[in-house]
Swiss-Prot record:
It comes from Ephedra tweediana (Vining horsetail). One of its GO terms (molecular function) is 4 iron, 4 sulfur cluster binding. The gene is psaA. Phylloquinone binds at residue 683. This is Photosystem I P700 chlorophyll a apoprotein A1. NCBIfam families: psaA. Belongs to the PsaA/PsaB family. The PsaA/B heterodimer binds the P700 chlorophyll special pair and subsequent electron acceptors. PSI consists of a core antenna complex that captures photons, and an electron transfer chain that converts photonic excitation into a charge separation. The eukaryotic PSI reaction center is composed of at least 11 subunits.
Length: 720
């Protein structure tokens, strides 16, 4: 095995930090002339490409920056656990999760609990939290605040290790360029992160989570439950709960795996006590994932010479109509970090959105399903993160095209062919957007008009002209009936949302029930299709035209972001790849807003609510989604106004502190937006007269103040 590192390449010194712009070529030439340097500093601090041309140096910076990122994540996690240990009512919640609300943020008594959620239960004074950490802690077997303390300290130790690793692999033993091999990276990430990660989590769940949750579900007092290490060290404790533990690993090696069926189950549905997935199902899932990925982590050929060669697979991939096929794609992935990143971000972003949809349909943690605020927060959080990450995929795809793309190695392959018929792709997408926009909006306009004219029988709704989502309903039905044929041992389908007549309630609250789909969902679904297609249109146009267009044939020379193609060429502003990312973000926001509105109203109308002793379910908004959401007016009146009025009227309720913060945040937002609306020229003129006054008094600064450039102004604008 070759030595793949370079020893002591860069000495550790803080002197560089005192030297302004040690990574900026413009600043290195001398002191900055104008205040624009501050903005450029923010824009370029992490743009390693602009600091150096050397791919090895860029790769090392990325590698060590990842350790820094991990350190920040560990510090953040540690903070969460510390808050749970020091400022939370976790132990009280654990003893009575249906009546006590989670809180991990104490407030000075002078503020008064009566303006902060009222009583969170158990006489605790604090703000109700909606991060979902309590259910995660219970699922992982944490029974006391002391354990949270220990985990928080562990997090800090890991953060320190990561910071050390980041420093060590840049200053002491920096990897050579030949060390960054795609096959090795794939193998290690598949086997290490996903394989061993899942295996260790499955192990933890079997030995710690399962027994502790079993006892908690049975109503045992958390203080009487043995500590995690006792379950690990003393097998007899486990055998009392799960007799098959007495057989050890014998059934595993003799392939008699059914012996383990009490810890590795395939039940489907939810645990009726906690409203979460069966923990034994989750263990089974992670064990299976671990096996798959440990095998997958040995698939690719490295210097050991066994396994698949990605290059060979790609180059063999040719169709009758696709020219050179995938030839040349391997070179793209091995020479451009941006290309790799774009691919990974697109996949990760899509997965994050899939997670958002699983958190409510298959709630993984105990008592998560009845904490509606947390459910709403988790859905919103994962949708937004997924949206941002997908936009990032388009951004890095465009940067790859501008900075890293080499057309000679990609002649007539699939990538080249996509670029060559980009006009057809974009014009088709454009037509799709127009079609979806007019038709989906048109259905609503029709309904509003008929409603206003008093002709409900002529509206598109479940009670008049039906537009049932028959394919979605067929899919739901398939999932309800499938387990009988595909998994005879399963007691329920994968999710109760598919249909059937299962209703899971915890305490007096609904955890989950079948979600019916009707005309209202069909209409809003097409709004989703419309907004997503527009986002894709903008992003894809930015990527496909990043290097050149009919308007600006030499776009690649202007770079990833530029305001206009110089003076004297009107109509060439805001055409850079960066500007497409900017516009894409706005449409991503449009798309996700509609998704969150749909989710929020649908769940409150058809799923969430209380159940009476007679078994009658009363939903939060009384099942009004199907009839109200088929008109724009219904959305405005019965969703936006009905929900916003609670915030506006909150000043006299137990939520008043939140209402005031909400108001204050909007003031800050509007105040700063005001400066963006008033135009750059106005500010530049104002600045210059102020500079003139300073000059008169001989107190003028050496660095000349300057208004934001177009790109900078739009960057601040998009943050708003």
């Amino acid at each position: 095995i070759k030595i793949m590192v370079e020893r002591d390449p860069i000495k550790t010194s803080f002197e560089k930090w005192a030297n302004p712009g040690h990574f900026s070529r413009t600043l290195a030439k001398g002191d900055p002339e104008t205040t624009t340097w501050i903005w450029n500093l923010h824009a370029d601090a992490h743009d390693f490409d602009s600091h150096t041309e050397d791919l090895e140096e860029i790769s090392r910076k990325i590698f060590s920056a990842h350790f820094g990122q991990l350190a920040i994540i560990f510090i953040w996690l540690s903070g969460m656990y510390f808050h749970g240990a020091r400022f939370s009512n976790y132990e009280a919640w654990l003893a009575d999760p249906t009546h006590i609300k989670p809180s991990a943020q104490v407030v000075w008594p002078i503020v008064g609990q009566e303006i902060l959620n009222g009583d969170v239960g158990g006489g605790f004074r604090g703000i109700q939290i909606t991060s979902g950490f309590f259910p995660i802690w219970r699922a992982s077997g944490i029974t006391s605040e002391l354990q949270l303390y220990c985990t928080a300290i562990g997090g800090l130790i890991f953060a320190a290790l990561m910071l050390f690793a980041g420093w060590f692999h840049y200053h002491k033993a920096a990897p050579k360029l030949s060390w960054f091999q795609v096959e090795s990276m794939l193998n290690h990430h598949l086997a290490g992160l996903l394989g061993l990660g899942s295996l260790s989590w499955a192990g933890h769940q079997v030995h710690v989570s399962l027994p502790i949750n079993q006892l908690l579900d049975a109503g045992v007092d958390p203080k009487e439950i043995p500590l995690p290490h006792e379950f690990i060290l003393n097998r007899d404790l486990l055998i009392q709960l799960y007799p098959s533990f007495s057989k050890g690993l014998t059934p595993f090696f003799t392939l008699n795996w059914s012996e383990y069926s009490e810890i590795l189950t395939f039940r489907g549905g939810l645990n009726p006590i906690t409203g979460g997935l069966w923990l034994t199902d989750i263990v089974h899932h992670h064990l299976a994932i671990a096996v798959i990925f440990l095998i997958a982590g040995h698939m690719y050929k490295t210097n050991w010479g066994i396994g698949h060669s990605i290059q060979e697979i790609l180059e063999a991939h040719k169709g009758p109509f696709t020219g050179e096929g995938h030839k040349g794609l391997y070179e793209i992935l091995t020479t451009s970090w941006h290309a790799q990143l774009a691919l990974n971000l697109a996949i990760l972003g899509s997965l994050t959105i899939v997670v958002a949809h699983h958190m409510y349909s298959m709630p993984p943690y105990p008592y998560l399903a009845i904490d509606y605020g947390t459910q709403l927060s988790l859905f919103t959080h994962h949708m937004w993160i997924g949206g941002f990450v997908i936009i990032g995929a388009a951004a890095h795809a465009a940067i790859f095209l501008v900075r890293d793309y080499d057309s000679t190695t990609s002649y007539n392959n699939l990538f080249d062919r996509v670029l060559r018929h980009r006009d057809a792709i974009i014009s088709h997408l454009n037509w799709t957007c127009i079609f979806l926009g007019f038709h989906s909006f048109g259905l609503y306009i029709h309904n509003d008009t008929m409603s206003a004219l008093g002709r409900p029988q002529d509206m598109f709704s479940d009670t008049a002209i039906q537009l049932q989502p028959i394919f979605a309903q067929w899919l739901q039905n398939t999932h309800v009936t499938a387990p009988r044929f595909t998994a005879p041992a399963a007691t329920a389908s994968t999710s109760f949302t598919w249909g059937g007549n299962d209703l899971v309630t915890v305490g007096t609250k609904v955890a989950l029930l079948p979600i019916p789909l009707g005309t209202a969902d069909f209409l809003v679904h097409h709004i989703h299709a419309f907004t997503i297609h527009v986002t894709v249109l903008i992003l894809l146009k930015g990527v496909l035209f990043a290097r050149s267009s009919r308007l600006i044939p030499d776009k690649a020379n202007l770079g990833f972001r530029f305001p206009c193609d110089g003076p004297g060429r009107g109509g060439t502003c805001q055409v850079s790849a960066w500007d497409h990312v900017f516009l894409g973000l706005f449409w991503m926001y449009n798309a996700i807003s509609v998704v969150i509105f749909h989710f929020s109203w649908k769940m409150q109308s058809d799923v969430w609510g209380n159940i009476s002793t007679q078994g009658v379910v009363t939903h939060i908004t009384g099942g009004n989604f199907a009839q109200s959401s088929v008109t724009i007016n219904g959305w405005l009146r019965d969703f936006l106004w009905a929900q916003a009025s609670q915030v506006i009227q909150s000043y006299g309720s137990a939520l008043s502190a939140y209402g005031l913060f909400f108001l204050g945040a909007h003031f800050v937002w509007a105040f700063s937006l005001m400066f963006l609306f008033s135009g750059r020229g106005y500010w530049q003129e104002l600045i210059e007269s102020i500079v003139w006054a300073h000059n008169k008094l001989k107190v003028a600064p050496a660095i000349q103040p300057r208004a934001l450039s177009i790109v900078q102004g739009r960057a601040v604008g998009v943050a708003h």
